[in-house]
């Protein structure tokens, strides 16, 4: 076992503070509309320029092991806030640094760390309750655009695009962010249900210009097994051909004789048909086939349910107004399923999302939900250079997460003012002793820090003066760092999602409390590389003197 180095009490906390400060001081320069960029060196390719707190935090690794522990604890604040709310990572870092700094002063003066922690926890609970109290719900396109604009570092183009995307696909719709081929940033909306499976043969194409199979007023056969034998497929083919409507076949696979027969009949004009593989794998495939069946009013022909392909009737087939199939994707528009069944399926998937513990599963469930409830919006991000593209794409993703958070829990006034207004909630925090009262006061002081930092980043105004002026005001009155004016911030579009502000404070207090109650740090003793024996001359043994 490797020998360990142990550092105790004041020495340990002082070193942890150095690490906390190194990370926080690097991250907090990005806060607010006047925040600066941070340039990050990459081993390969061009450096990355970013104004995203969590991106900066994730890049910081310190040489000293205990300092690095402090830095990594605060990095956890940024990461957790990003995971939960998608934004507010810099605010969380600033709050964590302030709580730890003020707490350390009191521990050094003889306060009991565990009572400080209890006071901090009680204070945070009351502040969160006050934030919820002053929160207001959002629904309009204009309010959604405001949240997106602020989270994208005051880029109104991005705010408008996100608002338009949400307007098109709904609150539960999937909005994906991709890199555009050109310089233009644009929104593309895919109506209906799209899945990533294209036609099994180019001979199914009906439009040779676009290389797509276009089926109008189509029937849909949904089967969860492979189809290789024409005999089992023939009865349902004959029944659908009699109706004169085109047919889309979705199955695990279609091969051999069955595929060849379909292609020949399609070329002769006997059948209007197209065949695609079923989307997904395993249990997810079964669920997606069921989604398609409900959306189109059809039935999944599955032997597990007692249905056989050779006995299938036209009643088992789904229906859609239009289906478009290219070499990569199938899009079903205006499925003829009943609204009651579709709503029931949507609620079922929402329930699964609430119970899901895996980020991957949640993402896939949300995709399925969107395909059932309104479609998919794609934001194609354009820029002049790759460096600008990556930076802009990161901002769009942040703004998208923040906007979703705002829809969930509402918004509060931005610019650090909501935390100032929430200070009045501390009057409800009860302390059992002086040290707990000190813990409450630590939060009181820390809540001012984001506003101080936003002002400091403007480089032109005194933070203490601004803080006093904002405290004297009420409601939405605050300092707009972009225009350097005192005004009604909500009217000026300076708002934050309540979830972002709440998560930032909760996560910051949690990690700062852990650091305050730390009494010892254990690290590996670093090996001294200079003590390593030198390689003997003449190369490696058995290599004949080769290097």
UniProtKB/Swiss-Prot annotation:
GO terms for cellular component: cytoplasm. It is an enzyme of class 5 (isomerase). GO terms for molecular function: ATP binding; ATP-dependent protein folding chaperone; isomerase activity; unfolded protein binding. Residues 528-547 are annotated as: Disordered. Keywords: ATP-binding, Chaperone, Cytoplasm, Isomerase, Nucleotide-binding. SUPFAM superfamilies: GroEL apical domain-like (SSF52029), GroEL equatorial domain-like (SSF48592), GroEL-intermediate domain like (SSF54849). Its EC number is 5.6.1.7. Signal peptide: none annotated. NCBIfam families: GroEL, PRK00013.1, PRK12849.1, PRK12850.1, PRK12851.1. This is Chaperonin GroEL. It comes from Chlorobium luteolum (strain DSM 273 / BCRC 81028 / 2530) (Pelodictyon luteolum).
């Amino acid at each position: 076992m490797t020998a360990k180095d142990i550092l105790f009490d004041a020495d340990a906390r002082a070193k942890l503070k150095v690490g906390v400060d190194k990370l926080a001081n690097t991250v907090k320069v990005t806060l607010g509309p006047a925040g600066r960029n941070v340039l990050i060196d990459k081993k390969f390719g061009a450096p990355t320029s970013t104004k995203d707190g969590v991106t900066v935090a994730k890049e910081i690794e310190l040489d000293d092991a205990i300092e690095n522990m402090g830095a990594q604890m605060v990095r956890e604040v940024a990461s957790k806030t990003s995971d939960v709310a998608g934004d507010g990572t810099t605010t969380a870092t600033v709050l964590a640094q302030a709580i730890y700094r003020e707490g350390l002063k009191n521990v050094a003066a003889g306060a009991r760390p565990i009572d400080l922690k209890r006071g901090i926890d009680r204070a945070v609970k009351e502040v969160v309750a006050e934030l919820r109290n002053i929160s207001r719900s959002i629904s309009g396109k204009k309010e959604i655009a405001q949240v997106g604009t602020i989270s994208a570092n005051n880029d109104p183009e991005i705010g408008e695009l996100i608002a338009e995307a949400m307007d098109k696909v709904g609150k539960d719709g999937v909005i994906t962010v991709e890199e555009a081929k050109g310089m233009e940033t644009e929104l593309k909306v895919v109506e209906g249900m799209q899945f990533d499976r294209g036609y099994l043969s180019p001979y199914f194409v009906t439009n040779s210009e676009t290389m797509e199979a276009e089926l109008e007023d189509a029937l849909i056969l949904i089967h969860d097994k492979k189809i290789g034998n024409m005999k089992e497929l023939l009865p349902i083919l004959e029944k659908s051909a009699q109706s004169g409507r085109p047919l889309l076949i979705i199955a695990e696979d279609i091969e051999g004789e069955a595929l060849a027969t379909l292609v020949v009949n399609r070329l002769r004009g006997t059948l209007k048909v197209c065949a695609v593989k079923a989307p997904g794998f395993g249990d997810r495939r079964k669920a997606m086939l069921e989604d398609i069946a409900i959306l189109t009013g059809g039935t999944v022909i599955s032997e597990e349910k007692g249905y056989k392909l050779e006995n299938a009737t036209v009643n088992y087939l789904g229906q859609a107004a239009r289906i478009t199939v290219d070499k990569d994707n199938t899009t079903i528009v205006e499925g003829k399923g009943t609204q009651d069944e579709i709503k029931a399926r949507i609620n079922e998937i929402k329930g699964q999302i609430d119970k899901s513990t895996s980020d991957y599963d949640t993402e896939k469930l949300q995709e399925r939900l969107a395909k059932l409830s309104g479609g998919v919006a794609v934001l194609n991000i354009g820029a002049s250079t790759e460096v600008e593209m990556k930076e802009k794409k990161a901002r769009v993703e942040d703004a998208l997460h923040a906007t979703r958070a705002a829809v969930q829990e509402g918004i509060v006034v931005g610019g650090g003012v909501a935390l100032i207004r929430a200070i009045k909630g501390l009057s409800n925090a009860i302390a059992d002793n002086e040290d707990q009262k000190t813990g409450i006061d630590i939060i009181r002081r820390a809540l001012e820090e984001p506003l101080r930092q936003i002002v400091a980043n403007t480089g032109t105004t005194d933070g203490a003066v601004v803080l006093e002026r904002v405290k004297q005001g009420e409601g939405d009155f605050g300092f707009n760092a972009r225009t350097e004016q005192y005004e009604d911030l909500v009217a000026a579009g300076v708002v934050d999602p309540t979830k972002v502000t709440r998560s930032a404070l909760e996560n910051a207090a949690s990690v700062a409390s852990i650091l305050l109650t730390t009494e010892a740090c254990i690290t590996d003793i670093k090996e001294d590389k200079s003590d390593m024996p030198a390689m003997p001359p003449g190369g490696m043994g058995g290599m004949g003197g080769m290097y």
